[in-house]
């Protein structure tokens, strides 16, 4: 039997590591770590051979373990060759957490002389860069494979999203936590930006994207304000005119420039247009279900129930297309 025809079974309570292929315990933390390990390979372009999980980090006489480390190309998997360090936490862990927050990542970066970038992921996502004088500063993202610095994406850089649900969740959490808005209001602002993102992908005539922000812009207040006033607000004006039955004539983006900059940096490298419809549907259902329907006792039918029903019906009838969601 060829290797291509072998199906590896994963026992309950386990998850297969996308880097090593070995089984690991299925926990909320491990799920986040595996999502980001996969993202490093499929979206950022790093080879699996340069990535390692649970890497020992020596800090004085103590030793800690970094969740994920990307090493210099082809280098040994040792602390002295660390290029990027990632700390991946459960979706409910805040960056301000004293034990597992962003300070933990910064301490690992400070202890690793060759580490240039870091990424902390939990309830939100934050990237950091070590400057020439050794200071660790905020940056929009970590660089892609083969690049020295993060940059503003172009149209050809857009990739399909494999875990859109987590991206939407972090964005909504950030708007709700930092924008001074209630959950329903935060959802509506998120909806505006999703429409802006799709419109920019579909209607942009050049390789330049409006729904994008560069590292220098994100570091300055004037850059963030320029993003809002010169790119996103005009983009939303076009969206509003195209969808007058969704958005009112006097609506505009209500977010502060700093909050908007975070959302754009989270979504700018993904293609909502090219992402699989089921992935988009699952992400949207969770976003809507958490914010608009539960208080009225209304919920989306679970997707596994939908899939099961469709398969049962398909085995009974020969029609090419059927839907079980007519309520």
Region spans (language model):
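Charged, often low-complexity linker/regulatory segments
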Residues: 1-43, 153-174
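Domain-level recognition of nuclease-like catalytic cores that cleave nucleotide substrates
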Residues: 2-9, 120-159
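Active-site metal-binding core of divalent-cation-utilizing nuclease and nuclease-like domains
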Residues: 22-24, 48-80
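Structural motif
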Residues: 27-30, 176-191, 254-255, 273-278
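Conserved catalytic cores of phosphodiester-cleaving nucleases, focusing on short active-site segments
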Residues: 36, 66-72, 80-92, 108
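Long recognition/docking surfaces used for binding and targeting
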Residues: 195-292
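Conserved S-adenosyl-L-methionine
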Residues: 301-327
């Amino acid at each position: 039997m060829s290797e291509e025809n072998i199906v590896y079974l994963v026992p309950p309570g386990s998850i297969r590591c996308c880097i090593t292929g070995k089984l690991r315990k299925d926990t909320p933390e491990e799920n986040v770590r595996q999502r980001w390990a996969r993202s490093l390979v499929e979206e950022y372009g790093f080879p699996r051979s340069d990535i390692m999980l649970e890497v020992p980090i020596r800090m004085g006489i103590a030793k800690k373990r970094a969740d994920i480390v990307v090493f210099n190309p082809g280098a040994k998997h040792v602390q002295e060759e660390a290029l990027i360090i990632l700390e991946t936490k459960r979706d409910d862990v805040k960056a301000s957490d004293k034990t597992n927050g962003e300070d933990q990542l910064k301490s690992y970066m400070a202890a690793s002389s060759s580490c240039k970038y870091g990424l902390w992921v939990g309830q939100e996502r934050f990237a950091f860069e070590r400057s020439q004088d050794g200071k660790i500063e905020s940056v929009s993202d970590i660089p892609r494979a083969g690049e020295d610095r993060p940059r503003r994406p172009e149209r050809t850089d857009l990739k399909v999203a494999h875990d859109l649900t987590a991206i939407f969740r972090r964005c909504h959490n950030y708007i709700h936590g930092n924008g001074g808005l209630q959950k329903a209001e935060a959802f509506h602002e998120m909806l505006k930006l999703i429409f802006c993102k799709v419109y920019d992908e579909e209607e942009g005539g050049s390789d330049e994207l409006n729904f994008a922000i560069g590292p220098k812009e994100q570091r300055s207040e004037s850059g963030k304000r320029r993003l809002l006033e010169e790119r996103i607000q005009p983009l939303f004006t076009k969206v509003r005119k195209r969808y007058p039955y969704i958005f009112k004539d006097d609506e505009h983006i209500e977010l502060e420039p700093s909050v908007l900059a975070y959302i754009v940096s989270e979504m700018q490298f993904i293609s909502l247009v090219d992402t699989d419809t089921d992935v988009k549907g699952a992400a949207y259902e969770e976003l809507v279900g958490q914010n608009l329907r539960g208080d009225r006792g209304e919920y989306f039918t679970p997707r596994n129930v939908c899939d099961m029903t469709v398969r049962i019906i398909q085995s009974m009838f020969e029609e090419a297309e059927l839907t079980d969601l007519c309520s």
